[in-house]
Amino acid sequence: MSEGWHIAQINVARFRAARGSPAKAAFEAALDEVNALAEAAPGFAWRMIGEGENADGSVFGDDRLTINLTVWRSIDDLAAFAYRNQTHRAIMRRRREWFVELPAYLAMWWVRAGATPTLHDAKARLDLIARLGPTAEAFDFRTPFPHP
């Protein structure tokens, strides 16, 4: 654990079809359960909850995006949920059914413990990793950077 620092992450996915489409019903139906499991997971600190620009792609200029913005106590805690939680993994195995491939869909960065990132900051981090690849300001699971 990184005393005084937490890990923020944004991941985005672009739906193949419009929201509410029967093709994505299984994904949309699973969101509440997956979010509840995340909130109960060891190391979970915060997640963006809301409607409008807090949950959709309006900040990104794309209404087919779904956005997940969370803060965890450590990269290990985030990885444990993302890769070892069976319910989350089951949803992730089906992602190609629902989403198109994006050049950059995940960015992680360090925040002070107790801080909550804005969606605008998260978008800037995702843009940064898309432009430059992993850096200390925006990285991924394969190329993590230590806290400042």
Give residue ranges: language-model regions.
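Tryptophan-centric aromatic hotspots in well-structured domains and transmembrane helices
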Residues: W46, V71-W72, W98-F99
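Short cationic amphipathic helices and targeting signals
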Residues: T66-T70
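An amphipathic, aromatic/His-enriched active-site/gating alpha helix that lines ligand/cofactor pockets
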Residues: I75-P103
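Short S/T/G/P-rich N-terminal loop/turn motif that feeds into the first structured element of a domain
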Residues: M1-L65, D77, A104-P148
